[in-house]
Structure formats: C-alpha cells, structure tokens
UniProtKB/Swiss-Prot annotation:
It comes from Gallus gallus. This is Protein argonaute-4. One of its GO terms (biological process) is mRNA catabolic process. The keyword RNA-binding applies. Residues 758-779 are annotated as: Disordered. GO terms for molecular function: miRNA binding; RNA endonuclease activity; single-stranded RNA binding. Gene3D superfamilies: 3.40.50.2300, paz domain, Ribonuclease H-like superfamily/Ribonuclease H. Residues 152-271 form the PAZ domain. The keyword ATP-binding does not apply. Required for RNA-mediated gene silencing (RNAi). Binds to short RNAs such as microRNAs (miRNAs) and represses the translation of mRNAs which are complementary to them. Lacks endonuclease activity and does not appear to cleave target mRNAs.
Length: 794
C-alpha cells in the first residue's frame, strides 16, 4: 500500500504497521482527518488478489507523557505510547522473519535439529519494548520453538507413525494409525505438487477412512450428470498420474462439506508453520538439549544478535524515521545477593543446615517432625520379569534404612506386596487394601515407565478413597541410589503430615511476629488447540507459623459466553476465589487457633497484559472471603504476581562471580532498579542455582500492599519461602506456595483423565469432562475428606 500510493499519500514516509489495524507515522499524512479508501493488489495462489483498504486519522500519540512517566512524575505509563514504539521497532523484523507472538524466527540454515514426528527446532529472537527507570528498554533474547518441517506428506506420515520404509507399508493404515495421523495433520496447511508451478495451498480438515483406491466423490460430467469416481481413477484420468500408494488414505481439505480429497503423495507440508500442539516428553527433552546454553554463551549470542546487521542492530529505516536510537551494549546495573536462610532440622541433634549456592545436604540430619509408618503396602505394576521379587525386597529394605536415618522410621516389612497389571486393577486393589488393613498409612506404587496407571492411582487415592500414595518408576527400584530414596522420604513425610524442616525462627522477617497466612494461586489451561479440556484453578494456604504445612483447594473453571477478550480474562480470574480463600482461612484457624492478621498472596500464571484485569476482581474476592467470616475481619492483603515466562536474563559483569558449570548469577541475586518499572513496585529474584542452561530470574510485581512492606523485606521474605519447598533440599525458582498451587492444578488434570483410554500422555478427559457437565467436573476434582487437609500433592 505504501509503495502503491507513495506519490499521492506517503511520499518518503516510513510508517510502522502492527499487522492488524494500526499504522503509525512520524508526521501527519496529507489527508487531514478524512477517510481514504484504496485498493491494493497482491499476488495470490494461482491468481492475484485485490484488497480494499481504508485509512483514517485516529489520534496523536504523545511521547511527552511517556517521558514524564519514565522520570517518575506520573503513576501510569501511557500504554498507547509503549505500543506505538513496540510496533515501530517490530516493523522491519516482521517483514524479514516469521513472527510468533513477540518472537521472530527464520528457517534453519546451517543447522538441523529434528524433534521427531515431523517437527523441528527453529531458532530466532524475542523482542519487546519495556518501560524502565528513566528510559525505554529494548528486551532482546534468543528464542526457539517447534515448527513443522517442510516435507512431502508421505515422509511426514512415516515420521508420525514410526514407519521406517514406506515401501514396506503395503496395507492400508489401521484405525489407530489413521487416528494418530489425523490428530497430527488436522489444521495444517499443505500445498499440491501435481499442478506444475501453481502450488495451490489448502488446510487439512480430516483424513479419509478409505484409501485413495476406494474413496469416492461425485464427479460432474459434461452432460450435467454426476457419477461416483474414486480419487485414484480421477487422478489417472485428469492428470495421467498413476498413484504409487493407492492403498493409503487421502487428505480431506478445505471445508468438510465440500468433499475435496487429495492423495497423500501429491501434497507437501507448507513451510513456516509453527507447532502449537503439545510436544511429547521425548520432543520436549530433545528441545531442551538443543536450546540449553550456558549463561556466558547466551550472553555472547544475544550480543552478536544485536550487533549483527541481519537482526535488530542494522540500519533500520523505520527507527531512523521516528528518531529512535538503540544502544548496542547490554545494560549494566548493580544487583545484590541476599543471604540464604538457615534451616532447622529435628531429631536429637536439632541440626541446622546452611544452604550454599541454593543447595544443602540432609546427611546426618533428621526431619523436624518425622512420621512413624507402621502399616504400609507395595503394589508393583511393573512386570515381574522387569522387577523381580528380590529387587523389590532390596528396594524396600533400603527405603526403610534411609527413612530411619531421616527420622521417619518405616517399621517392619510391608503388610502387602503384590504384582498387578493395568489401570483397571487399581481401584479394586486399593479398596481391598483399605478394607483389609486397618490404619494403612501409605501405598508405594511401582510404575513401568509412562503409563495411565499413574493417573488412576492418583484419582483413586486422592479423590475416591483418601489414601496416601507414593509412585516410583521401576528403573529407580532396579537401580536405586541413596539420593533417590532420600527424595522419596521428603515427599512421603510431607504427605503423611510430617515437617521436613523449618526456617530458623530468629532469622525470619518481622511479618512472622503476628499470625500470617501465605496463599499461592494458579490457573492452568489446556494445551493450545484442545478446546475440550477445562481450565483448572488452584489455591493453597499455609497452615502453621513456620510456614511448612499447606492445604489445597481446587476448582474447574467453567467457560461462559463472552467475547474472546472477555473470555481470556474470565478464564484467568479465579471464579470461586471467595469460597476457596474462605475454606483456607477456616482451616488455618482450626490448625493454629489464630486468625491471620496478614494475607500474603502469590499469584502465578498471569501474563503481563492481564495483571490488573485479574488482580482487582481477585482482591475483591479475598476481601469478601474475610468479611463473610466476620464483618470487621479485615486483615492486610499483599497481592504479588509471580512471573517466570519472560525474557529478562541476568549475567555476571564480573566473570569471577559466575557460579556453577553454566556460569550463572549466584542464587539469591536480586535486582530492583534500572530495568524495573519506573513507578510500580517490582523486582527480579534469581532464587535458585541454575543446573542446566541460563537461569531465569522470577519477576515479582506487587499490585497491592496493605502491609506496607519495604522492598528489602518482601525480597527477603520471598527468597526465604523459596527454601521451604518440601520436595527437595534446594531453593526453588518461585516461592513454595506458588509452586504448590501449580502442583495442585496439574494433579487435578490427572483426576480428570479417563482410565478407559490408554493415554500415557494423560491427555484424554472423560466423556463428561468436556465442559458440558460442570457438576461432574467439580466432583471429579473434589479431594476425599481424609486427604483434603494433607499435602497429597507433595
């Protein structure tokens, strides 16, 4: 459009365009405030396409207000100014690369990282404009995502179905093969190869049940009549093409009711299609290996990216037009490393552990409050030839020894130790155990790799019978280690009501001087493209003064009829938060005999654009929960959003301060200046020791604070809570309550799994669970009353 109407309208201007409906110019266009309609012709598939475009002046974006906000003179940063700068800086990359969200990708050149299943890794970069103290910042980071490989459909099918040689596939696909293939290819764009240069593109809507040799469609004859013709016959008559694989199915493309069929062998996957479907575990593992970079390597890669002419640092006419200058150097700033809290253990010695770089050792220490296990059972779902009786006996003996050392003695042999097969045997076996063995405290379940048995064990144990279960992979039974057994004990002790360790009281922040409850909340959504599964909301609350024990509440989020934007917010806001918080406050009072005077609420899973729209209704809901208990009950609320999905990375300016094999910043590194918001209360905290790749600091945004925390107090409190996660002897990347809320929401996904489908992915949701029957959904995630007040999710 700009090229077509250069003389009449645009002249030498270089407008920035957001790809949707907004165009920005540095100076007014010579059209006044009138609407101008124009036509633009672009080359299409087979023929040119003409588009009607209207442009009209909307408003002036003031950069003066933005400068005042950056200097701290205004409380609100004008969003329209930030959006305009973002669009302008993204305009050139959008034309050069394939945009995905806020990142840009280009096809692999000089590297190839296959993920299997027709998918591959594309590398690129993330770019966004962010307000900071005194300046606007350009956030650049290396990025990677999965794309579908441009290849013939026959090859794609072979990858998806693990067919080594297509010539050996002489029979039609089985039903299960066809279903798997359909699931992968539905929604993808393909282009045809049998029409010469005219590579027409189509979107796949289905895969036919019948092969091309038998799949028929009504062919219109010249006399106006129609006759049934097979796809194979049609291609032979029309294109003189004898199909090589007439026994394979066809792709149904376009609209389903139009019956357009294409043989697999005349189709290719169109290049540049991002994979939005969930990666398999193997693909995720391959992706992590392909993308993990040590901190110094990532730093070098980002610097190279910025300085290279091919990316953001090159001559950009759009930046020049608007007078925008981007400095090539990374921002240098001063951070500080917070002191790690000491952790109190129990037993006779009452030992104290001092973390070193986010890690401490439990050897020679006993749990602060260990549980004695007198009645326990073992159910082995791995086949006997894979897990022999002598190996099982050795495992249980070693577990008992380690548990005794840890101060959680497992007394005697298991009362029951039997082999079992398949998810269907879980419920009858567990019912038998509950009836037969009075006071049964724990069932240890041995699993044969990834299996639907896990989901069924958790459904029956957590929701149906109220029994504590601990699953162990068979590989860890056959070849066990003290570390694995010790980690099992951490989980078992917490599940049964024990306390692994506590923060040393005299080192805790002053917020602990009065009763305080820590809440963690999260909402998990189904993978993209899976409209059948519901979103799940979870809220957990601390139940003691340490804080160590937590209780959980969980709900299925029902979707209402809204616009897409309203739906986005309604699915993210926790709908029944008032009742969930009320339950936790009542339970806190029952556990401690105190009413909390402060509520510290850590909220995970909220994106930057949704923060305020989610925070206000949730704050009101928390306040309502308090008032519903007593009219005058008004504890101070602090509402903190915890974000991990961002692209800010911290690197040590001084190489001597790098830590570990990956050269990351030390655990406890905190930044609350220079790159933080000019007027809002936020900070970055890297609370964990990076094991692989570059550590990602968590970003904390304080949206409401009745409790008047100083930045130092809240940073230290948050860091200490990262050391209270029961599953490991390491500080974790987000505070324990926020982490537990995620675990609870993910566990509820397993409670919804349909055991009648052999789903190793846990991907099938039972028939009533597709959003049509909210009552059945609510019942499916309802925890049994015997388990409700335990840390079943640990």
């Amino acid at each position: 459009m700009v090229r077509h109407f250069k003389m009449q309208i645009f002249g030498d201007r270089q407008p920035g365009y957001d790809g949707k409906r907004n165009m920005y110019t540095a100076h007014p266009l010579p059209i006044g405030r009138d609407r101008v309609d124009m036509e633009v012709t672009l080359p299409g598939e087979g023929k040119d396409q003409t588009f009607k475009v209207s442009i009209q002046w909307v408003s002036v974006v003031s950069l003066q207000l933005l400068l005042e906000a950056l200097a701290g003179h205004l409380n609100e940063v004008p969003e329209d100014s930030v959006q305009a700068l973002d669009v302008i800086t993204r305009h050139l990359p959008s034309m050069r690369y394939t945009p995905v969200g806020r990142s840009f990708f280009s096809p692999p050149e000089g590297y190839y990282h296959p993920l299997g299943g027709g998918r591959e890794v594309w590398f690129g970069f993330h770019q966004s404009v962010r307000p900071a103290m005194w300046n606007m910042m350009l956030n650049i980071d290396v990025s990677a995502t999965a794309f579908y490989r441009a290849q013939p459909i026959i090859e794609f099918m072979c990858e998806v179905l693990d067919i080594q040689n297509i010539n050996e596939q002489t029979k039609p696909l089985t039903d299960s093969q066809r279903v798997k293939f359909t699931k992968e290819i539905r929604g993808l764009k393909v282009e045809v190869t049998h029409c010469g240069q005219m590579k027409r593109k189509y979107r796949v809507c289905n895969v036919t049940r019948r092969p091309a040799s038998h799949q028929t469609f009504p062919l219109q004859l010249e006399n106006g009549q129609a006759m049934e013709c097979t796809v194979a016959q049609y291609f032979k008559q029309k294109y003189s093409l004898q199909l090589k694989y007439p026994h394979l199915p066809c792709l149904q493309v376009g609209q389903e009711q139009k019956h357009t069929y294409l043989p697999l062998e005349v189709c290719n996957i169109v290049a540049g299609q991002r994979c939005i479907k969930k990666l398999t575990d193997n693909q995720t593992s391959t992706m992590i290996k392909a993308t993990a970079r040590s901190a110094p390597d990532r730093q070098e890669e980002i610097s190279r990216l910025v300085k290279s002419n091919s990316m953001v640092g090159g001559p950009d006419p759009y930046l020049k037009e608007f007078g925008i200058v981007v400095h090539n150097e990374m921002t240098e700033l001063t951070g500080r490393v917070l002191p790690a809290p000491m952790l109190q253990y129990g037993g006779r010695n009452k030992t104290v552990a001092t973390p070193n770089q986010g890690v401490w050792d439990m050897r020679g220490k006993q749990f602060y409050a260990g549980i004695e296990i007198k009645v326990w059972a073992v159910a082995c779902f791995a086949p006997q030839k894979q897990c022999r009786e002598d190996l099982l006996k050795s495992f249980t003996d070693q577990l008992r020894k380690i548990s005794k050392d840890a101060g959680m003695p497992i007394q005697g042999q298991p009362c029951f130790c039997k082999y079992a097969q398949g998810a269907d045997s879980v419920e009858p076996m567990f019912k038998h155990l509950k009836l037969t063995y009075v006071g049964l405290q724990l069932i240890v379940v041995i699993l044969p790799g990834k299996t639907p048995v896990y989901a069924e064990v958790k459904r029956v144990g957590d929701t149906l019978l109220g029994m504590a279960t601990q699953c162990v992979q068979v590989k860890n039974v056959v070849k066990t280690s003290p570390q694995t057994l010790s980690n099992l004990c951490l989980k078992i002790n917490a599940k049964l009501g024990g306390i692994n360790n506590v923060l040393v009281p005299h080192q805790r922040p002053s917020v602990f001087q009065q009763p305080v409850i820590f809440l963690g909340a999260d909402v998990t959504h189904p993978p993209a493209g899976d409209g059948k599964k519901p979103s799940i909301a979870a809220v957990v609350g601390s139940m003691d003064g340490h804080p160590s024990r937590y209780c959980a509440t969980v709900r299925v989020q029902t979707s209402r009829q809204e616009t897409s934007q309203e739906l986005l917010y309604s699915q993210e806001v926790i709908q029944d938060l008032t009742n969930m918080v009320r339950e936790l406050l009542i339970q806190f009072y029952k556990s401690t005999r105190f009413k909390p005077t402060r509520i510290i609420y850590y909220r995970g899973g909220v994106s930057e654009g949704q923060m305020k729209q989610v925070a206000w209704p949730e704050l009101i809901a928390i306040r309502k929960a308090c008032i519903s208990l007593e009219e005058d009950y008004r504890p101070g609320i602090t509402y903190i959003v915890v974000q991990k999905r961002h692209h800010t990375r911290l690197f040590c300016a001084d190489k001597t301060e790098r830590v570990g094999k990956s050269g990351n910043v030390p655990a406890g590194t905190t930044v609350d200046s220079t790159i933080t918001h000019p007027s809002e209360f936020d900070f970055y905290l890297c609370s964990h020791a990076g094991i692989q790749g570059t550590s990602r600091p968590s970003h904390y945004q304080v949206l409401w604070d009745d409790n008047c925390f100083t930045a130092d107090e809240l940073q230290l409190l948050t860091y200490q809570l990262c050391h209270t996660y029961v599953r490991c002897t390491r500080s974790v990347s987000i505070p324990a309550p926020a982490y537990y809320a995620r675990l609870v929401a993910f566990r509820a996904r397993y409670h919804l799994v349909d055991k009648d489908h052999d789903s190793a992915e846990g991907s099938h949701v039972s028939g009533q669970s597709n959003g049509r029957d909210p009552q059945a959904l609510a019942k499916a995630v309802q925890i049994h009353h015997d388990t409700q007040h335990t840390m079943y999710f640990a």
